[in-house]
Swiss-Prot record:
Positions annotated as active site in the UniProt record: H160, K164
Pathway per the UniProt entry: Amino-acid biosynthesis; L-lysine biosynthesis via DAP pathway; (S)-tetrahydrodipicolinate from L-aspartate: step 4/4
Described function: Catalyzes the conversion of 4-hydroxy-tetrahydrodipicolinate (HTPA) to tetrahydrodipicolinate.
Source organism, top-level taxon: Archaea
Record-given protein name: 4-hydroxy-tetrahydrodipicolinate reductase
Predominant subcellular localization, coarse grouping: cytoplasm
E.C. number: 1.17.1.8
Enzyme class: oxidoreductase
Native source species: Methanococcus maripaludis (strain C5 / ATCC BAA-1333)
Gene Ontology process terms (BP): diaminopimelate biosynthetic process; lysine biosynthetic process via diaminopimelate
PROSITE patterns the UniProt entry points to: DAPB (PS01298)
Chain positions recorded as NAD(+) binding sites: G8, A9, L10, G11, R12, M13, D34, G102, T103, T104, S128, Q129, N130, Y131
């Protein structure tokens, strides 16, 4: 039985992950952590997430180290925000707890700080902007499209619910990174357009971020040339698509001793 801790336990992803873990053979929720001074601290996380009492009280991040030690957590799943996630990762790594990181929006410095802590403490971690299986097939397909249609004009469009805090999405940025890594030409990433921009240059790869309603996550990569246009789209209709991938990542990283992995590793797409 893999003992799992979840931070951001009452967030959109965290609560769904906890529900799914309770329904998954071989996994056990042993700790649930949220923000300091949370008004529901001490209440049973199973009851808070609608699965019934499981005997695990909601804890807060200011007591993270104690909670991880006492619970015996082997894997910690984090879907929070960049700054708290870095602190959580450093604490967990120091205690020998493996990590599944789904938080997005890191600066390069935050990402480096987190990865250094993981490497220095010789734990294992998966870090991904999107754990959905379909999205990772989307990513893999982009490698081929960038290689074969590299001379086309390339645009990326993403849409999310009105509550999303970062833009563009981590998934869109990862898609752009994959495209750039597989082009046989120079490219320049830009974000939206405004004013008299002039003729589009061949080097441009533009990301457009849309926000509204309750959209879980839509991503489209467009490759356009004179006379034709190819569009590759992934649409998530519920967070369960992400959660299913997280469960795979938890099982994957639980068997690793050290190293930093991504969802291509989890899904054997490399």
């Amino acid at each position: 039985m893999v003992k799992v801790a979840v931070t951001g336990a009452l967030g959109r992803m965290g609560s769904g992950i906890i529900k799914t873990i309770t329904e998954t053979d071989g996994l056990d929720v042993v700790a649930a952590i949220d923000i300091p001074n949370h008004p529901k601290k001490g209440l049973d996380i199973g009851e808070l997430t609608g699965v019934g009492k499981i005997g695990v009280a909601l804890s807060t991040s200011d007591e993270l180290e104690v909670v991880l030690k006492e619970s015996g957590a082997e894997v910690l799943v984090d879907f929070t925000a960049p700054a708290p996630c870095v602190n959580t990762a450093k604490t967990a790594a120091k205690l020998g707890v493996n990590l599944v990181i789904g938080t997005t929006g890191f600066t390069s410095e935050q990402r480096a700080e987190m990865e250094n802590a993981i490497s220095e403490n010789k734990v294992a971690a998966t870090i991904s902007q999107n754990y959905a299986v379909g999205v990772n097939i989307f990513f893999k397909t982009l490698e081929l499209l960038a290689q074969k249609l590299g001379d086309y004009d390339i645009e990326l469009i993403e849409m999310h619910h009105k509550f999303k805090k970062d833009a563009p999405s981590g998934t869109a940025l990862r898609a752009a990174e994959i495209i750039q890594n597989n082009l046989n030409r120079d490219s320049n990433l830009i974000f939206g357009r405004k004013g008299i921009t002039g003729e589009r240059t061949k080097e441009e790869i533009c990301i457009h971020a849309l926000r509204g309603g309750d959209v879980v996550g839509d991503h489209t990569a467009m490759f356009a040339a004179d006379g034709e246009r190819l569009e590759l789209t992934h649409k998530a209709s519920s967070r369960q698509s992400f959660i299913s991938g997280v469960i795979l990542a938890v099982k994957f990283v639980a068997e690793k001793k050290e190293g930093i992995y991504n969802t291509f590793d989890v899904l054997d797409l490399n």
